[in-house]
Amino acid sequence: MKVIKNKKILKDFILFTVLPFVIPFIVEIPEQLINVRVKWLFIVLIAIFDFYFAYKSLIIKEKNNNREYIQQSIRYSYSGAHEIIERKRDTLSHETEFNMIDVKNNMLPYDIHFHISDICKEFKKVISSITKINNEYITTAFIYRYVYEGCSEKDSQWKRIGGIEPISKCELNNFVKKEDTTYYHIINNNIHYIFGDSKEELAKQGYYHLSGRDEMYNNVGSVFSIKLAFGNNATTFVEGIITVTTHGKFFTENMDIDNASSVLRNMIIDEIFPYYRKLIETELGLLYIRHISK
């Protein structure tokens, strides 16, 4: 690695220092020693050579920056997931220490809703870190419902866990039926996720319902909403949707990389969210088990 780095330093030194430094000396060579046309041909060739490899070097640098950004973001994701597991372990340890576990009355010795909310908050922190947007401009919301065979109408209603995302003064189960919401499209149109760097553009396409809070920020912001579920190979027992929104800030406004929106979308879906998906789906499974055991 050190040898490669030293070669790169030497290459950049030649391209950006030596070659430009040589050109003025070529210009000063007397015509008696070198033909004028040959002299200018050398200068043009050196300039073309320098420009070409300088451009190529910048392209490589941009790719390396993108790669480094993705790797750093994945580290943020892994670190956040690790902290969630540690907090859950500490909660169990604390409750056993003070004899707070009563399996007869509660088969699970911790608050599942609180833990799912904690996972959502940690995911929000990761989004904040990789987009460089302060936490106060980001909100997360998580909703879920039971969909197992034979569940009652009450159980099949959507419920919210944590999150402070305003629902435009509309009751949740009425809100998800609005055709201009991300929830509606994910629930009814078999769309796995919705990602938009501009809420306003999504709203124009009928995929996002602008809220009162959005209007406070002139409808500036981004949204990411994705579906999760717990079940077995035969059926699904419970499903949920996590939504991350920004207010007054776009996901990519602080990202100085090419195709920032596509890079961020693919990175969240393929590299970052899978950590949190497994954590949340596990808790949804425990939520279902506790529910049917009552």
What annotation goes with each model-predicted range?
Residues 238-294:
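Juxtadomain coupling helices with adjacent low-complexity linkers
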Residues 145-147, 230-232, 246-248:
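Short, flexible loop/turn elements at secondary-structure junctions
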Residues 3-4, 107, 254-259:
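Short, flexible/disordered intra-domain loops and linkers
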Residues 145-218:
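Regulatory sensory and allosteric helical modules in signal-transduction proteins
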Residues 38, 45, 49-161, 290-294:
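Intrinsically disordered, low-complexity terminal regulatory regions
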Residues 1-64:
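Hydrophobic, helix-forming membrane-interacting segments
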Residues 206-236:
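Helix-to-coil/beta transition segments that act as allosteric "coupling" elements at the rims
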